[in-house]
A protein has these predicted regions:
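Accessory interaction regions appended to the cores of large information-processing enzymes
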Residues: 1-189
Length: 189
């Protein structure tokens, strides 16, 4: 996600006898960790401590299915700020559901982005076509990381980070540009 947002999640169900009630306010912001980071900053007992693990579990389960194309969410920090409970109707399940509702509402507003895999491309080509190769890498949304002479005789090296989706058919394209003299390797970054 790219923005910091606060979201409310309220799970309330009454069906004769005991109902279900869980209510949370959670702040979502970009995190620095690959996994979701969970904190609680609840004051005054508005959400009892024994429900904190249920809120965290609800968020962790929800993170497995992102709001964009259903992919898992990474680099997320979630902070439980506030909420409310009912002495009879509140349960761990109700707070787990409330957290999942807050997650769905909050992430929609938090400017989510879909990440794509990036790879490390090394291209060995004759010096005479270095400009063409660099132009082609730029056209493929690549970031040139370095260039210069290589250990392979008569060939220069261009190193770049390139989105994986842009490297399909690269072998054919490189062969055409270099008249069969270019070599490349592609590894995940």
């Amino acid at each position: 996600i790219q923005a910091k947002v606060k979201a409310e999640g309220k799970h309330k169900k009454q069906s004769g006898g005991h109902g279900q009630y869980g209510h949370v306010w959670i702040e979502f912001e970009p995190g620095s960790n690959e996994k979701m980071t969970f904190e609680e900053k609840v004051f005054g007992g508005s959400v009892p401590k024994n429900y904190f693990p249920a809120v965290e579990k609800g968020l962790r389960e929800a993170c497995e299915h992102g709001v964009l194309a259903g992919y898992p969410v990474v680099n997320l920090k979630a902070t439980l700020l506030d909420g409310s409970y009912h002495p009879v109707d509140s349960s761990e399940m109700a707070f787990k559901m409330a957290a999942a509702i807050a997650y769905k509402e909050g992430l929609k507003q938090a400017k989510p982005v879909l990440l794509e895999p990036i790879g490390y491309l090394k291209v060995y080509v004759p010096e005479s076509i270095m400009g063409d190769i660099i132009g082609d890498i730029n056209k493929r949304r690549g970031q040139i990381m370095g260039m210069g002479e290589s250990e392979k005789e008569g060939l220069n090296l261009v190193e770049a980070e390139v989105p994986m989706s842009e490297t399909f058919k690269y072998a054919t394209d490189l062969r055409s540009m270099s008249q069969g003299r270019g070599i490349f390797t592609f590894d995940f970054a």
